[in-house]
């Protein structure tokens, strides 16, 4: 097909939008792919919609190739199915809730596990119907507290979500492996740089869970990779190697000291070394101190939040994402001044595990805080710290938690060297849900022996509209976007850069021949626009190939520009065949 720029609904911008922070947001707006309607809500203009449809086509091809069957559920859903799984409550404020005119509760679907499970229950009842994989490409809604970065973190977005149903755990393993491979093919075809990372299951539940993270310095997720081996994980899923337990017999008793100058960990360490405190015969370091972070935890459905103490070594900061992932689906926030005022036993800056336990506050510790480890920590009195407080003797945590930051150079699991940190954007997430949802909906199937059995379920999500933004993040330069042939709204951008009548007529002919060869062509036929503006727009819009008909056409030459690559001069009579071949090669 041919689309003429003279009639295309498009307005390019030379300046970045004021609210844009990341390159993808700036360029997608400037190039006329999207337009803001409200915070986190965007319209898809013709070029943007074509690119999204191209991504959807790749996704459909790969989903169909593994036996997926497409259907479509409504975005507007009743409350009852989500009550069955408790996610009406667990989703908290991120759920868009509404009532109809009769007062019945509804929601805008953030995800559709409930609907898939309930539908399979309604329609299937025999093992002969399984395995089955169903998927949809549907608009989703989440009330993000701080929507940002354009369509990377929006309130309305398009996702592909698929669900496998198998009669056995071995069958689930096979379905999971098929989806994992399909996702790799999708992302490879789209030209993405990504990592497959171990992940937490969160509110989705289930066991095995992996994320596909697109590598990006603007990513909201931090992930780690081992320097040797193949280990990769979202930091939320990294498991800290526990400390070594020690015999508490014969350890010195804890001693409380006046510490008037100890407002920071560094100051506390300097004070300890100034009075020659020894830890295992060496000077004190920040790792020998114990931070007590007070947070408020509200379980789903609870009216009040409960205070909880989080213990971690003083050389580590609390990682709120790791903390939240460890306590999900509960909501977590740091204690504020009013909480300290309402609880006088909380002495800000000097909170310790002993005072928390005495006042009935749950205490969760970093895995390094094990029996026999000795710590310098708050004495629950202003300007006083205790030295030599021993875990398992002087205090005992109620449990352990992954809440401390992961640092570059930390040991990798299984002896695979050390960890390196990188940032990424989640583009896909696959789960082995098991029987959480099929049990909740009492999905009972007759097995080969005529006995009732509950099928096991996998969940596989992929962000379609987010993928477009991620590709813009990874594939751009100072001049504009740089799409792959799989994603580009048009494979070839034909530019009539010469007002000579013969060149304009030839440009028309080239566009027609390229279209006849099966390529999608964007033809810049604007008569009153200068060549310089046309070239700038071509770079901004980002089509992979641009065919320029300029002054050289009189000598039988045309110019081919590969976006982000080389410029070359082609013989006019061979240009179409060469471009068709180059597009075909770029697809492979």
UniProtKB/Swiss-Prot annotation:
Keywords: Aminoacyl-tRNA synthetase, ATP-binding, Cytoplasm, Ligase, Nucleotide-binding, Protein biosynthesis
Localization: Cytoplasm
Free-text comment on this protein's domains from its UniProt entry: Consists of three domains: the N-terminal catalytic domain, the editing domain and the C-terminal anticodon-binding domain.
Subunit organization: Homodimer.
Domain of life: Bacteria
Pfam families assigned to the protein according to its UniProt record, in alphabetical order: HGTP_anticodon (PF03129), tRNA-synt_2b (PF00587), tRNA_edit (PF04073)
Protein name: Proline--tRNA ligase
Known EC number: 6.1.1.15
GO biological process, one term: prolyl-tRNA aminoacylation
CDD domains linked: ProRS_anticodon_short, ProRS_core_prok
Predominant subcellular localization, coarse grouping: cytoplasm
MF (Gene Ontology): aminoacyl-tRNA deacylase activity; ATP binding; proline-tRNA ligase activity
Example of a GO cellular component annotation carried by this entry: cytosol
Organism classification: Bacteria, Bacillati, Actinomycetota, Actinomycetes, Mycobacteriales
Keyword Ubl conjugation: no
Family from the record: Belongs to the class-II aminoacyl-tRNA synthetase family. ProS type 1 subfamily.
KW Secreted (keyword) present: no
Reaction equations catalysed: tRNA(Pro) + L-proline + ATP = L-prolyl-tRNA(Pro) + AMP + diphosphate
Annotated function: Catalyzes the attachment of proline to tRNA(Pro) in a two-step reaction: proline is first activated by ATP to form Pro-AMP and then transferred to the acceptor end of tRNA(Pro). As ProRS can inadvertently accommodate and process non-cognate amino acids such as alanine and cysteine, to avoid such errors it has two additional distinct editing activities against alanine. One activity is designated as 'pretransfer' editing and involves the tRNA(Pro)-independent hydrolysis of activated Ala-AMP.
NCBIfam families per record: PRK09194.1 (NF006625), proS_fam_II (TIGR00409)
